[in-house]
Amino acid sequence: MEELLAELLKLRAALLALRPGARLFAFWDLDGTLLRGDCSEGLHEGGRELYPGLVHLAIEDGHSPDYSGDDSGPLRCRNDYRELGERVGAWLAYPFLAQIFSGASEHDLQALAARHFDTTLRKFYFSASRTIFDGLAAVGVEQHILSASAEFFVRGAAASLALPAHRLHGIRVRTVEGKLTRELLYPVTYAEGKVTQLIEIIRAAEAETEQPVFVLAAFGNSFDTDKAFLAHVVRQSLPVGRPLAVMINAGFAPTNYRGLFRSVRQKKVVGDR
């Protein structure tokens, strides 16, 4: 991954030499890409829980009218979530994990997530991913998270990533007077929805400046949820060089995507140091 960082820094330098005022971006998935495991679902390996997911913690804390109130709530939720994914698909299952907290305080759930990231999840960021993430941040590349987890959970990672909260994007539901509802807001940051969110971010940046805006890189870990936005980035035409799209621990690419992405394997996390 250090070689990829060096390549990106070289691309950054070439773009700024050609367009000195350019605004440069990189986009990341969160779960399985920056974070080992899943902030919503937790991390379990070898029959052992390495950390609990935020859905479990929030249900235990009493934030879900559907599942809080008895000890079986987290298990019932997990079973319903898996059944949705198997019978209907991830496009419905991922939003479900945001909608089950209808009536809860968005502020309270984001605070719960921030505590979990700051005390536990920050130790499970992949070391190599953080090397690239921190290296790009150090030279002023504007980085955004595009996650299929609920946005009120994802934004809990802001302090641990040293990012403004508005740069962390997840699945959103409408809020009324600070309380969550079941009504989804679009785009839903799953698959093609991540492309739509990325385009909205770049168009907003272009509207703020007369200088050019370039996307250097995109990082993901799933050909289901991430291939669309990675492909969108790597197929850009830059005035010099070529953007990178990196798949982490993703396995074999579908036929139409072979040779398009860099493939990286990693397991070590910052807490292993």
Model-identified regions with their sequence ranges:
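Detector for glycine-centered tight turns/loop "hinges" at secondary-structure junctions
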Residues: 32, 62, 178-179
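Non-catalytic pre-domain segments flanking phosphatase-related domains
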Residues: 1-30, 35-42, 50, 56-57
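C-terminal cap/substrate-recognition subdomain and adjoining C-terminal extension
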Residues: 2-25, 107-273
